[in-house]
Curated annotation (Swiss-Prot):
Stretches for region Disordered: 75-122, 212-295, 424-726, 764-784
Name under which the protein is recorded: Transcriptional activator somA
UniProt superkingdom: Eukaryota
Compositional bias (Pro residues): 702-715
Quaternary structure, from the entry: Interacts with ptaB.
Feature: compositional bias, Low complexity: 215-233, 247-259, 564-592, 644-661, 691-701
Compositional bias per record (Basic and acidic residues), positions renumbered to this chain: 103-117, 234-244, 629-638
Function: Transcription factor that controls the expression of genes related to the process of conidiation and adherence and regulates biofilm formation. Controls conidiation and adhesion primarily by affecting the expression of the three regulatory genes flbB, stuA and medA. Required for virulence in an egg and a mouse infection model.
Length: 784
């Protein structure tokens, strides 16, 4: 036990206790700091006054009167005489100054005789006696020191006070040991800054009680101290970083400068740091800079608990680096506590997202809000099931994420991962947008796995469809073609592909969610776990159809396989990207032209009759008979002629078995066509003048040896496009053609088809042509 505690806190039994107020210096002599209250006569008068105040507040009036009458006892009192209430001495606004003293807690006034003066004390506002309060505290401390008290609060207070006293004493002793070195230390350092080093500095160091050290050891100490000083001077400039402070680990090697910038250690000026009498180098104590131990203690760190190597490295750092080290340590400590708290709650490894492996990628919430699914290439599991992470499917040690902080941190992590992924996709898309030979990129985006295709993982149309149309016709129509001009289409943001990968089920009405939109031939039309594209960035479809298991053999199928009907027969060729299924809310005549204004006599009779087979002779048509002579807005023959010209051109270029209904009618004289939406060549059935919504289309990509596929009669419950009021939502059927041959639209030239020059190929677009609104599918008013 040190001298302070021996003299002050632990006296012998019955010994004096007067050393407690003077525990800072361990001396029992009275302190003379110039304060008048420290004069013994004044202290005696104050004690007498407090005793008098105690008698008054306890009701001992006779004892108080005896103190007043005794002339040998001096008291600090006020004059007992009082004037009128408005002119009392030291009263404000006529209010008594001793109102608090005369009133007790219960409202009853303490009756103080008028002949007794009021005590003049600084603590007059207290209701209880100061002497009584002081004695109560003193008694607790007194008996707690002698281990006879039963108060736990007093024990804790005494233990805390003694610990703080010990730490202060140790710090004070260390400062006293370092004090003789500081004046000699600062002089050489200041001269070194000015470029001057005294010649006798080394001699002074050798003569400074270093008999136990050899010259080699002293030289090594000088080199080490010089290196540390240079590192400190280099690190002191880190405060001028424009990007702010970057926290570093206290034990990290990044604090040291690079080897190329390290100063030469040989033949350099000797460090001005002096050696202590015991031969040890002291810390770099600069004037105005806090000591390393004092800095650690100010931040609540105990230097004794640190590793000696860590503490030595901390002392060698500059003031700015020391502040950074303490800041980083506090941050790491807070992070450690937060992870420990999360581990105590059952979350493994301090993860923010329970039930998710540490190496798992983005998680997107399900539409029902009950789970998450990953945004990576393993969107479909090995058994074809959607890789969902439901709330109930968690790790054994997991816990439901119902904490606000945990949810917020998980959202931040997801947002950061999604931003990084989108940035990578945008860069890959710009790099692989087009090739030098004009061919479109492969449907996998070179350099990217199938699960990270930039175009396949986005829903909605491209910001500029006209530029993407010039890239060429890709084999997979869903990888970058423009959307439908129909702005009212409910599936407008999923124009990329007819497949259910980009199908937004959240916008689909409930009555259209039947099995007719998801075919039985799902294993033949979809790839396996690695053969399908990832979901869009905002998928909303989580219907039961996607939960169907996909056979493993479907991985080797053609990834651009077509959808099949429920009956199993293949549909016609794939429609153009502009021709997409309509929404049930706003049926429009999008995929067909209206009947001619003056149809032939037998045209109406052929509408209700079943469609003829492909091998039957074509129905006589009025389109090729009249020769166009002038531009008439209602010349329907020219409209039908211009529709067949791109159809015949594309069909002749893509298929080996063109039906006779197309080959028998050569194109007429090239004339400017009416503005129409780009249609697929097989959008109109040549076997009938008026196709219905589910009219099967002719196969144009079938090989020559295969027989022509027969088409079943149309459903009689379906209505024609002439009737715009379709009450039955089941009348629509997403009939998609069979793309067994991926070369359907390979050679179709969209640039020639959409060319606005009327003199080049005969497919020009003349904006001066006017036409009625009832025959234009994009009409939105009286005229365009």
């Amino acid at each position: 036990m040190n001298q302070m505690n021996v003299t002050g806190m632990n006296p012998g039994a019955g010994g004096p206790v007067g050393g407690v107020p003077m525990m800072n210096n361990g001396s029992t002599a009275p302190r003379n700091d110039g304060n008048v209250n420290n004069i013994p006569e004044t202290m005696i008068n104050n004690l007498n006054t407090y005793i008098y105040d105690y008698f008054l507040k306890r009701g001992y009036h006779e004892c108080a009167r005896a103190l007043v009458k005794d002339e040998s006892i001096k008291l600090n009192t006020e004059p007992p005489t009082k004037t009128s209430p408005g002119h009392r001495r030291e009263d404000m606004n006529g209010v008594e100054g001793d109102a608090i003293m005369t009133d007790s807690k219960d409202g009853d006034k303490i009756k103080i005789p008028d002949d007794l003066p009021r005590p003049n004390l600084a603590s007059e506002s207290q209701q209880s006696s100061f002497l009584l309060d002081w004695f109560s505290l003193f008694w607790d401390f007194f008996w707690a020191q002698r281990k006879k008290g039963n108060s736990n609060d007093v024990r804790q207070y005494l233990q805390h006070t003694q610990n703080m006293m010990r730490l202060r004493e140790q710090q004070h002793n260390q400062l006293l040991r370092q004090q003789p070195v500081m004046p000699r230390q600062m002089g050489p350092l200041n001269m070194r800054r000015n470029g001057m080093v005294p010649a006798n500095l080394q001699k002074t160091v050798l003569q400074n009680n270093t008999g136990g050290l050899s010259q080699q050891q002293i030289a090594q100490l000088q080199k080490n101290q010089q290196m540390h000083m240079m590192q400190q001077m280099q690190r002191e400039h880190s405060d001028m970083d424009m990007n702010g402070h970057r926290p570093q680990s206290p034990s990290s090697a990044e604090n040291a400068p690079s080897p190329s910038k390290r100063p030469r250690l040989e033949n350099g000026p000797m460090n001005g740091q002096q050696l202590a009498p015991n031969g040890r180098g002291q810390g770099q104590a600069m004037p105005g800079q806090p000591n390393s131990q004092a800095l650690l203690m100010q931040n609540g760190l105990n230097p004794r608990a640190m590793n000696p190597a860590q503490f030595a490295g901390f002392q060698q750092q500059g003031p700015a680096a020391q502040q950074k080290s303490i800041q980083v340590y506090a941050q790491n400590l807070a992070l450690h506590h937060s992870r420990s708290a999360l581990n105590n709650q059952g979350i493994p490894n301090g993860l923010m997202n329970p039930g998710v492996m540490p190496n798992q990628t983005d998680l997107v919430p399900m539409p029902d809000g009950q789970g998450m699914y990953p945004m990576n290439g393993d969107y479909y599991g090995t058994n074809g099931q959607m890789a969902q992470v439901r709330a109930g499917m968690q790790t054994p040690g997991g816990q439901h994420g119902n904490h606000a902080l945990q949810d917020y941190q998980m959202q931040l992590m997801l947002l950061e991962q999604q931003n990084k992924r989108r940035l990578m996709m945008a860069r890959q898309e710009q790099d692989s947008m087009s090739r030098a030979d004009g061919q479109p990129p492969m449907p996998g985006q070179q350099g990217l796995p199938p699960g990270t295709s930039p175009q396949g993982s986005r829903a909605g149309t491209s910001p500029n469809p006209n530029e993407q149309m010039k890239r060429g016709t890709p084999k997979m129509p869903q990888t970058g073609l423009p959307g439908s001009p129909n702005a009212a289409d409910a599936m407008g943001q999923n124009r990329g592909s007819p497949a259910a990968m980009n199908f937004n089920g959240g916008q689909m009405p409930p009555d259209m969610a039947g099995g007719q939109f998801f075919m039985k031939g799902m294993p033949d039309a979809m790839g396996g776990p690695n053969g399908m594209r990832p979901p869009s960035s905002n998928p909303a479809f989580s219907g039961p159809q996607m939960g169907q298991p996909i056979p493993a053999g479907a991985v080797n199928r053609v990834p651009s396989g077509n959808w099949q009907q429920q009956q199993g027969q293949p549909m016609g060729p794939q429609q153009s990207p502009a021709q997409q299924p309509q929404s049930t809310g706003t049926p429009q005549t999008q995929n067909s032209m209206p009947p001619p204004q003056a149809p032939p006599a037998g045209a109406n009779a052929a509408r209700t009759s079943p469609q003829s087979q492909n091998a039957a002779p074509p129905t006589p048509q009025q389109a090729n008979k009249p020769a166009p002579k002038k531009r008439e807005p209602k010349d329907t023959a020219r409209k039908r002629t211009t529709k067949k010209q791109p159809a015949a051109a594309a069909a002749a270029a893509n298929t080996a078995a063109t039906p006779s209904s197309e080959a028998e009618h050569p194109p007429t004289t090239p004339t400017p066509s009416t503005p129409i939406t780009p249609q697929h060549p097989s959008s109109f059935n040549k076997a009938g003048p008026n196709p219905t919504t589910s009219a099967p289309q002719q196969p144009t990509s079938a090989p020559a040896p295969q027989p022509i596929v027969q088409q079943p009669p149309p459903d009689q419950t379906q209505q024609s496009f002439n009737d715009l009021s379709i009450p039955d939502a089941s009348a629509f059927n997403l009939d998609f053609s069979a793309l067994e041959n991926p070369d359907i639209l390979e050679n179709f030239d969209f640039d020639t088809f959409l060319n606005t020059d009327a003199d080049t190929a005969g497919f020009g677009f003349d904006p001066n042509i006017s036409y009625p609104t009832d025959g234009v599918e994009t009409g939105a008013g009286d005229g365009l």
